[in-house]
Amino acid sequence: MRLLPEWFLLLFGPWLLRKAVSAQIPESGRPQYLGLRPAAAGAGAPGQQLPEPRSSDGLGVGRAWSWAWPTNHTGALARAGAAGALPAQRTKRKPSIKAARAKKIFGWGDFYFRVHTLKFSLLVTGKIVDHVNGTFSVYFRHNSSSLGNLSVSIVPPSKRVEFGGVWLPGPVPHPLQSTLALEGVLPGLGPPLGMAAAAAGPGLGGSLGGALAGPLGGALGVPGAKESRAFNCHVEYEKTNRARKHRPCLYDPSQVCFTEHTQSQAAWLCAKPFKVICIFVSFLSFDYKLVQKVCPDYNFQSEHPYFG
């Protein structure tokens, strides 16, 4: 019976110790902080509870971990705003709202034609952009390797495709606002392909270029009085680049000939008087002439343009 107290302490000692500790630390839903340093003069006994730490924002009591963001700071923000110490907040970016959007009806290549022969090559491409506000823009570029005259005009759908009047000489009329013709873009460039550069006279290119530009500009480049009242256009951009390339002559490979390469770009802004607007393209050189009318359909958006 002497060993009874020892067995009693071994069996019930841990249970009694837990009871004693729980009596000193009251239960609470929040974690408690115990002082681990010696108590100072006038301070409480060791084991006294310390106040919970404040958050770095001054918005209330911090949570169990320093990186835990408080769930609701409405009351604290209201109090801070009343005191004049409202913390800075991030401004939210608003999505950009486009006031107006240009409606692109056709892509690059709405009207085009390509001619490639043994003596020269010609490429004309363009596009039409409808701005929805009653105006449209015509963008045009061409690349040629032969002396000649090129004309691009805006015409109504009733314009006939014919060669009549192209070769008749006559004075060049005064250009109108509605004229979209590159008159005189290719005058005086030099002899055609196949003629030796040494044999070219100084007046050959100039006289021929003027003779070609006059009749063609009058017949195809400038619309009539009725069309000039209907169309209202002005040039926004115009640029022309010329380059001369040498190559062996076709009739005599021992001689050196040259070809004229011309690249031009232009853009016009016009009013839209008709539902369908056609582009009239004409090209006239020494041994080749071409006229073509392209009428894109504004009601049907297609990748392939309509050639009239």
Swiss-Prot record:
Where composition is biased (Low complexity), the residues are 40-51
Please list the tissues where expression of this protein has been recorded.
Expressed in brain, spleen, and testis.
Which example biological process does GO assign this protein?
A: neuropeptide signaling pathway
Which residues are noted as glycosylation sites? N72, N133, N143, N149
What processing steps or modifications follow its translation?
Answer: May be proteolytically processed at the boundary between the N-terminal non-conserved and the central conserved domain in neuron-like cells.
Query: Where located?
Result: Secreted
**Has keyword Membrane?**
no
Sorted alphabetically, the keyword list is: Glycoprotein, Repeat, Secreted, Signal
Q: Where is this region: IV (linker domain)?
A: 164-224
**What's in the GO CC field?**
extracellular region; GABA-ergic synapse
GO MF annotation: an example: signaling receptor binding
Sequence segments annotated as region (V (Cys-rich)): 225-308
Start and end residues of each stretch annotated as II: 24-84
Q: Where is the signal peptide?
A: 1-23
Annotated stretches, region: III: 85-163
Give the start-end ranges of region Disordered.
40-59
| Source taxon at top rank | Eukaryota
Main location (coarse class): secreted
User: Of which family is this protein a member?
Assistant: Belongs to the neurexophilin family.
Protein purpose: May be signaling molecules that resemble neuropeptides and that act by binding to alpha-neurexins and possibly other receptors.
Q: What is this protein called?
A: Neurexophilin-4
List the gene name: NXPH4
